[in-house]
């Protein structure tokens, strides 16, 4: 009788341990290892047209006039990271680095870029984080490792827009975690 109770206890404890060890890995893979709709070829999202029609016209005009430009850096791990940038309409030392959220990319932040560039007169830099847009990587970093890339993008902004740039970093969701 004691032997049977001991075996049942070991089986129950084994199932509980297996559950609590396996489930976190499954959940992590489901949340971070997903296919990223914000990865790949760059396009201006339809959401901008539907919800921010002025931002769409502005983004199209920057695109057509070749004011919105691409740049790339290599981070400390050797991954190629991408960003868009646009110089302000008038000379300024103010720059906004606008960081996207989970499963988004730099073009998804054009609606905020419109506010900073068109209305406030800032230079803008919109990076693609790991595994997003045209940036390398095989998984989201959830903001923790992205923070190092954002610091590197700040240095790059100084090179693009001039030294002693006053910067604001504006992030949404995962981008705010940087």
Where would I find each of the regions flagged by the language model?
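An N-terminal hydrophobic leader/cap segment in hydrolases
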Residues: 17-73
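A short loop-to-beta-strand scaffold at the N-terminal edge of the catalytic core in hydrolase folds
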Residues: 76-87
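Alpha/beta-hydrolase fold nucleophile elbow
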Residues: 161-173
């Amino acid at each position: 009788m004691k032997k049977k109770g001991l075996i049942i206890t070991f089986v129950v404890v084994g199932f509980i341990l297996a559950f609590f060890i396996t489930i976190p890995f499954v959940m992590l893979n489901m949340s971070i290892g997903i296919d990223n709709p914000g990865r790949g070829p760059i396009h201006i999202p339809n959401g901008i047209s539907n919800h921010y029609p002025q931002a769409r016209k502005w983004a199209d005009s920057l695109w057509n006039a070749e004011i919105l430009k691409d740049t790339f850096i290599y981070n400390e791990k050797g991954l190629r990271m991408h960003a868009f940038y646009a110089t302000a309409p008038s000379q300024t030392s103010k720059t906004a680095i606008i960081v996207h959220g989970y499963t988004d990319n730099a073009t998804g932040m054009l609606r905020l870029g419109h506010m900073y560039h068109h209305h406030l007169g800032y230079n803008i830099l919109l990076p693609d984080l790991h595994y997003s847009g045209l940036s390398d990587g095989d998984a989201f970093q959830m903001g923790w490792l992205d923070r190092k890339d954002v610091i590197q993008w700040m240095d790059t902004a100084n090179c693009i827009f001039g030294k002693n740039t006053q910067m604001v970093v504006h992030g949404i969701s995962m981008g705010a975690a940087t």
